[in-house]
Amino acid sequence: MRVTDFSFDLPDELIARYPMAQRNASRLLTLDGNTGTLADKQFTDLLGMINPGDLMVFNNTRVIPARLFGQKASGGKLEILVERMLDDKRILAHVRSSKSPKVDSIIHLDGGYEMKMAARHDALFELELLSDLTILEVLEAVGHMPLPPYIDRPDEDADKERYQTVYNQNPGAVAAPTAGLHFDDAMLDALKAKGVNIAFVTLHVGAGTFQPVRVDNVLEHKMHSEWANVPQDVVDLIAQTKAAGKRVVAVGTTSVRSLESAARASEGELKAFSGDTDIFIYPGYQFQIVDAMITNFHLPESTLIMLVSAFAGFDHVMAAYQHAITQKYRFFSYGDAMFVTKKAH
């Protein structure tokens, strides 16, 4: 398959640059992966689509304020975007400046903090904090929320809350698991009251999620690596759910990738998993665990639209996106959502 097969023209006004006033006020496009049938709904209608005994799996990563501003010793300005935290003092990061900082040079951050350029790893820089504080403490003090490039505005105070799920727990993501942004506490309580089971995995979404695919042939793409954790209690819940003939519903592509990574690591039989994953899901992939998913509308030619196409069928997904454009759904991180059931292979 060609990467350009996943292209579509999106009017600029359909890119959501701000979230809705209420989390669950978004629209919801449902797609039946077997038939291609579409239905226009509200996100709150999801309550009627998830059945008692179904298991919903959420990604509980917490977005860190991963964008830092500062200057080199020479006075040149730079911008740092954390890719991942290596430990309490060291990060791997993208650095934007007129000239790359040299090894052992000092970077002066806003707020008076300093970092040393320790090493370079291809396009990423290893930076070391020169402070008694931890990286996380400095990020919380002077970091900015790492809004995606297409939102095309400076971050605001409201983004600290809204570019974050209500159930976030484990700091480490530099992009939000956006399907989860639609859920508020009341909706989670309503799902539980209905008898829906809730479980949490962790995948620290990296900045690589916004990198364009730079090859023509889908098969030649090398996926970026992210850290994921699927604990034993989730594995047990999935086994019980499958045994009872109920569905595993993944909230977001990151939850899908976490569960399928765990299944891949143990060759199909799901076992607990913790470590880096570079799983790349595109049409032809056989899903082992997930039966239905909730996801936002993704960028053209992105690995995320490829994943959804693998799940529900390429033709069905591309037709759904054209429908969404015609019906003026809101796209990308702060936009509307889809509820998609898996196409039988």
Swiss-Prot record:
Listed pathway(s): tRNA modification; tRNA-queuosine biosynthesis
GO molecular function: S-adenosylmethionine:tRNA ribosyltransferase-isomerase activity
Lineage top rank: taxon: Bacteria
Gene Ontology terms: cellular component: cytoplasm
SUPFAM superfamilies reported in the protein's UniProt record: QueA-like
Compartments where found: Cytoplasm
Catalytic activity: 7-aminomethyl-7-carbaguanosine(34) in tRNA + S-adenosyl-L-methionine = epoxyqueuosine(34) in tRNA + adenine + L-methionine + 2 H(+)
Catalytic activity, EC: 2.4.99.17
Subunit structure and binding partners: Monomer.
Family to which the UniProt record says this protein belongs: Belongs to the QueA family.
Function: Transfers and isomerizes the ribose moiety from AdoMet to the 7-aminomethyl group of 7-deazaguanine (preQ1-tRNA) to give epoxyqueuosine (oQ-tRNA).
Protein name: S-adenosylmethionine:tRNA ribosyltransferase-isomerase
Organism from which the protein derives: Shewanella sp. (strain MR-4)
